[in-house]
Structure formats: structure tokens, C-alpha cells
Amino acid sequence: MAGRSGDSEEELLKTVRLIKFLYQSNPPPKPEGTRQARRNRRRRWRERQRQIRSISGWILSNYLGRLAEPVPLQLPPLERLTLDCNEDCGTSGTQGVGSPQILVESPTVLESGTKE
């Protein structure tokens, strides 16, 4: 189910538990003490978080053969994206909601430097 290329679910659950334990072993710093002490604790905490993130990525890639980050979704060019509902409107419970869109030319707001 959740595994890939023969990975067992038990192996996946073990890996997730290990990564969860790593993150739980580094709780956020307490907001007490002087400003400098709080800043130092936050800085050390962020550094440990970065180390945990890299260790988690290493565990995922070596034990499960996966990347820590998902593969980025490839989107079409912005020129091809539209918000026109006339072409392909879904009918999943949204019928009758809102009013039909009327396309109107937008006035040129900053056509000249004078106010009207």
C-alpha cells in the first residue's frame, strides 16, 4: 500500500517512528531568560532541526530508496492557465452558487497623471 518497490509496511512504519522520535527529541526552546540567552537557544534549536532534517532525508533515501522532498509538480505555463468557468465547470455540489461572470473591459486606471 504505502511502500514502493517491495518495501513492507512494517519497514515504512519503523522508519516513520524513528524520524518522529528524532523530531520529538528536540522540543522548542523555553521563552525564559535574557534576550541573548533566548536568541542563542533558538539558534541552537534551529541548527539541531536542520541536522534532524538532513538525517531524516538520509534515512528515507537509504532505507526506503526515496527522496526526502517530494518531486515538484510540473505546472503548465501561466499563459495557458485561465479562471474561465464556461469551459469546464465541475458539478460537485456547486451549482447555483454565485452568479454568472460577465466579462467587462477594465478601465485604464493610470492612463494619465491627472485625477478625474
UniProtKB/Swiss-Prot annotation:
Asymmetrically arginine dimethylated at one site by host PRMT6. Methylation impairs the RNA-binding activity and export of viral RNA from the nucleus to the cytoplasm. Phosphorylated by protein kinase CK2. Presence of, and maybe binding to the N-terminus of the regulatory beta subunit of CK2 is necessary for CK2-mediated Rev's phosphorylation. It holds the Pfam family REV. Residues 23-48, 92-116 are annotated as: Disordered. A motif (Nuclear export signal and binding to XPO1) lies at residues 73-84. GO terms for biological process: mRNA transport; viral process. This is Protein Rev. One of its GO terms (molecular function) is DNA-binding transcription factor activity. Residues 36-47 have a biased composition (Basic residues). The modification Phosphoserine is found at S5, S8, S92, S99. The RNA-binding motif binds to the RRE, a 240 bp stem-and-loop structure present in incompletely spliced viral pre-mRNAs. This region also contains the NLS which mediates nuclear localization via KPNB1 binding and, when the N-terminal sequence is present, nucleolar targeting. These overlapping functions prevent Rev bound to RRE from undesirable return to the nucleus. When Rev binds the RRE, the NLS becomes masked while the NES remains accessible. The leucine-rich NES mediates binding to human XPO1. It is found in: Host nucleus, Host nucleolus; Host cytoplasm. Homomultimer; when bound to the RRE. Multimeric assembly is essential for activity and may involve XPO1. Binds to human KPNB1, XPO1, TNPO1, RANBP5 and IPO7. Interacts with the viral Integrase. Interacts with human KHDRBS1. Interacts with human NAP1; this interaction decreases Rev multimerization and stimulates its activity. Interacts with human DEAD-box helicases DDX3 and DDX24; these interactions may serve for viral RNA export to the cytoplasm and packaging, respectively. Its main location: host cell. Escorts unspliced or incompletely spliced viral pre-mRNAs (late transcripts) out of the nucleus of infected cells. These pre-mRNAs carry a recognition sequence called Rev responsive element (RRE) located in the env gene, that is not present in fully spliced viral mRNAs (early transcripts). This function is essential since most viral proteins are translated from unspliced or partially spliced pre-mRNAs which cannot exit the nucleus by the pathway used by fully processed cellular mRNAs. Rev itself is translated from a fully spliced mRNA that readily exits the nucleus. Disulfide bonds: none annotated. Residues 18-26 are annotated as: Homomultimerization. GO terms for cellular component: host cell cytoplasm; host cell nucleolus. Keywords: AIDS, Host cytoplasm, Host nucleus, Host-virus interaction, Methylation, mRNA transport, Phosphoprotein, RNA-binding, Transport. It comes from Human immunodeficiency virus type 1 group M subtype B (isolate SC) (HIV-1). The SC isolate was taken from an ARC patient in 1984 in Southern California. HIV-1 lineages are divided in three main groups, M (for Major), O (for Outlier), and N (for New, or Non-M, Non-O). The vast majority of strains found worldwide belong to the group M. Group O seems to be endemic to and largely confined to Cameroon and neighboring countries in West Central Africa, where these viruses represent a small minority of HIV-1 strains. The group N is represented by a limited number of isolates from Cameroonian persons. The group M is further subdivided in 9 clades or subtypes (A to D, F to H, J and K). Belongs to the HIV-1 REV protein family. It comes from the Viruses. A motif (Nuclear localization signal and RNA-binding (RRE)) lies at residues 34-50.
